């Protein structure tokens, strides 16, 4: 049975897409069948994993709006065990087109229900907004990861996101849980970053992942090569961070296999 995890934060620049790509790739490297769903009209997960959105013929847009079979849109990536359900620019207009569709909040759920048994994990890179596409993603998901950057105003806007999650829980998806709060862009040398870590841990307590994603050059440059950081440099801090996150999620969900190693310390 697949675990569907959405990564959501309407605030840009928090590492949402980076985390979606690299968490999905890390789960795949650990040999869990993983699908990365690009539900962001910017299609950065699509390009960041090696596909040109301009050449995509069938995407999540066609699945949601035109009811095409998602199997006809899914792409195999260069990473074993990792598939992609891509996005392209047409997704920008999807929210307007969905207004008059039947059960518009459940379109993504209907799509993923057709394929979820073929994967261990489905990772959804949500749109950086709280619009209908994000509502669809949260309605389809079992849980949500909230990326928070270790910078000034880190908690700004989280109230709106948490309220949206609560609305989805009350009206559309009562089983939706918060998988965890993920601290990103951490620089141990900066006092502010350490203050943010403490502030977030005080606010969210046990919901904060033990794994913290550090600032890392290899992590930043990997998307320009169209690969995950673990495919770009498996020994980099970024690759190790995301492998540790994947292991933490696997253990939390009781899915650990004997071959999954303990977390690597830096």
Descriptions of predicted regions:
Residues 1-266:
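P-loop NTP-binding core
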């Amino acid at each position: 049975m697949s675990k569907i995890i959405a990564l959501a934060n309407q605030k840009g620049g928090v590492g949402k897409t980076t985390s979606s790509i690299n968490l999905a790739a890390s789960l795949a490297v650990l040999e869990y069948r993983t699908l990365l769903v690009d539900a962001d009209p910017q299609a950065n997960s699509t390009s960041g994993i090696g596909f040109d959105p301009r050449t995509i013929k069938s995407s999540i847009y066609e699945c949601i709006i035109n009811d095409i079979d998602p199997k006809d849109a899914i792409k195999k990536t260069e990473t074993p065990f990792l598939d992609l359900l891509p996005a392209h620019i047409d997704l920008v207009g999807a929210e307007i087109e969905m207004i008059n569709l039947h059960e518009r909040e459940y379109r993504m759920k209907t799509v993923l229900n057709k394929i979820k048994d073929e994967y261990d994990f489905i990772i959804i890179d949500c749109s950086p907004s709280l619009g209908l596409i994000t509502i669809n993603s949260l309605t389809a998901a079992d849980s949500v990861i909230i990326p928070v950057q270790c910078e000034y105003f880190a908690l700004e806007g989280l109230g709106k996101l948490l309220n949206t999650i609560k609305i989805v829980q009350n009206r559309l998806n009562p089983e939706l849980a918060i998988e965890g709060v993920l601290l990103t862009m951490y620089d141990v040398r900066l006092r502010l970053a350490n203050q943010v870590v403490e502030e977030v841990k005080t606010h969210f307590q046990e919901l904060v992942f033990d794994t913290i994603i550090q600032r890392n050059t290899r992590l930043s440059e990997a998307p320009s090569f169209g690969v995950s950081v673990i495919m770009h440099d498996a020994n980099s801090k970024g690759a190790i961070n995301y492998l540790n996150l994947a292991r933490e999620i696997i253990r939390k969900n009781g899915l650990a296999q004997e071959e999954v190693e303990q977390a690597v310390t830096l």
